[in-house]
From Swiss-Prot:
Functional description taken from the UniProt entry: Catalyzes the deamination of 5-methylthioadenosine and S-adenosyl-L-homocysteine into 5-methylthioinosine and S-inosyl-L-homocysteine, respectively. Is also able to deaminate adenosine.
Catalysed transformations (reactions): S-adenosyl-L-homocysteine + H2O + H(+) = S-inosyl-L-homocysteine + NH4(+); S-methyl-5'-thioadenosine + H2O + H(+) = S-methyl-5'-thioinosine + NH4(+)
Record-linked CDD domains: ATZ_TRZ_like (cd01298)
TM region(s), chain numbering: none
Cofactor binding notes: Binds 1 zinc ion per subunit.
Keyword terms of this UniProt record: Hydrolase, Metal-binding, Zinc
Protein name (Swiss-Prot/TrEMBL): 5-methylthioadenosine/S-adenosylhomocysteine deaminase
Cofactors that this protein relies on: Zn(2+)
Family stated for the protein in its record: Belongs to the metallo-dependent hydrolases superfamily. MTA/SAH deaminase family.
Naturally occurring in which organism (per UniProt): Nitratidesulfovibrio vulgaris (strain DSM 19637 / Miyazaki F) (Desulfovibrio vulgaris)
InterPro entries named among the record's database cross-references: Amidohydro-rel, Deaminase_MtaD/DadD, Metal-dep_hydrolase_composite, Metal_Hydrolase, MTA/SAH_deaminase
Length: 440
């Protein structure tokens, strides 16, 4: 007797990222009610299911949607506005001066462009921190991805609130407004140790505990940050945040570049996750996070792109390549950061960084969030080891289809939920707005 399902996907290869890292050649995947019903050999899965829709993808590879562990989606509107600068100069001289004029329309347009870029390159979920976050959520709701997001909390006025008290109240309102949306989850996001006070960080942690939300913070990104933290508070960033109670299993720390061995041990003992951003860290010369050492300690590490203003893309395929290459060079060891480990970071590690169980794998009961690559692309042939190709050969431009909760959001150059040409016209207006604010 066959079992009904909404969609039956057939493909030459399915990379499941399940507990056994099963790869199915000539496989099929059944989807019902937005979740994976079954995955396995084409003949067996097809015979066992009666689909409302059949997607025979032919010579294609199906894999879990990639999970971007740290980004600022709306900052696509600042892509390329300032490059080749240290982090603090980049922030204070170019980014903050524009951001103080932000409007909801600018943020929503930038975030929708970010969602388009992520869908086009196989990302189905992302961890976001920015300003006027309600506008980002509207873009996410339009595009259909999953997002764990939070309003950036500062110890000074932002475009979204006049003071920290109002900022924390805004987090409460955002949580109440969006908590019934199955694809949008809220977190508490103090920006960094150098933009907040000890009291404010403790209030953020208390709010995260009260609302039972994750906490997401930039931490130990540069040696400059470390020096500032020592000068201001008498401690390095990681022990400083630990002393304030921020480092718990609900925390995700972005960057974690400037770490000592003792600080890695401390992170491991707290259960906090790390979002590693190799390309942004390289471009800003922030340093290389000691990822192999963190993984050896059992720390959950995901891969993030950071914002397109500092990367300058949201492409997780190129981020995986950069991650693998960076750590081989940093360690002077070609066995360091092997392909399967990096793929795990971009899928299962991202799920851990988003505190969202079930993401990053295609197994029965997990969300049907997936992406499909065209195996006819010359750079993906011949294929001996799918993980190798996904990390070292794929560029993201082989993506044919991206699906979230069983819904096709992107296929063969077309976005199913929004008018992409209209968005391009809007971005031309946004560019003129940015140039005006910069006086160019």
């Amino acid at each position: 007797m066959t079992r009904p399902c909404d969609i039956l996907i057939q493909a030459a290869c399915i990379v499941t990222q399940d507990a056994m890292r099963t790869v199915v050649e000539d496989g099929a995947l059944a989807v019902a009610d937005g979740t994976v019903l079954a995955v396995g050999p084409r003949e067996a899965v097809t015979a066992a299911h009666a689909p409302a829709r059949l997607l025979d993808l032919g010579n294609a590879l199906v894999m879990p949607g990639l999970v971007n562990a740290h980004t600022h989606a709306a900052m696509t509107f600042l892509r390329g506005v300032a490059d080749d600068l240290p982090l603090m100069d980049w922030l204070t001289q170019h980014i903050f001066p524009v951001e103080k004029h932000l409007t909801p329309d600018i943020v929503e347009a930038g975030a929708l462009l970010g969602c388009a870029e992520m869908l086009r390159t196989g990302t189905t979920a992302f961890n976001d921190m920015y300003l006027i976050q309600d506008a980002t959520y509207r873009a996410v709701d339009t595009a259909g991805l999953r997002c764990l997001g939070g309003e950036g909390i500062f110890g000074f006025p932002s475009p979204a609130y006049p003071d920290a008290d109002a900022g924390l109240d805004l987090v409460r309102r955002l949580h109440e407004t969006w908590r019934h949306n199955p694809r949008i989850r809220q977190c508490v996001t103090p920006h960094a140790v150098y933009t907040t006070s000890p009291e404010l960080l403790q209030r953020c942690q208390a709010l995260a505990e009260e609302l039972d939300l994750p906490l997401h913070i930039h931490l130990a990104e540069t040696t400059t940050e470390t020096a500032q933290c020592q000068q201001m508070f008498g401690q390095r960033p990681v022990p400083y945040c630990h002393g304030l109670g921020l480092l718990t299993p609900r925390a995700t720390v972005a960057h974690a570049v400037d770490l000592t061995d003792d600080e890695m041990d401390l992170l491991a003992s707290t259960g906090a996750a790390v979002a590693h951003n190799p390309e942004s860290n390289m471009k800003l010369a922030s340093g290389a996070a000691p990822v192999p050492q963190m993984l050896a300690r059992g720390i959950a590490v995901g891969i993030g792109t950071d914002g397109a203003a500092s990367n300058n893309s949201l492409n997780m395929f190129t981020e995986m390549t950069s991650c693998a290459m960076l750590h081989k060079l940093r360690c002077m060891d070609p066995t360091c950061a092997p392909a399967q480990t990096v793929l795990d970071m971009a899928t299962l590690g991202g799920a851990a960084a988003l505190h969202w169980p079930g993401l990053g794998q295609l197994a029965p009961g997990c969300p049907a969030d997936l992406t499909v690559l065209d195996l006819s692309a010359p750079n993906l042939q011949p294929m001996y080891n799918p993980a190798s190709h996904l990390v070292y050969a794929a560029t993201g431009h082989e993506v044919r289809l991206t699906m979230v909760a069983g819904e096709v959001l992107y296929q063969d150059g077309r976005f199913t939920r929004f008018d992409y040409p209209a968005l391009m016209a809007q971005m031309r207006d946004v560019r003129r707005w940015v140039l005006d604010k910069l006086g160019r």
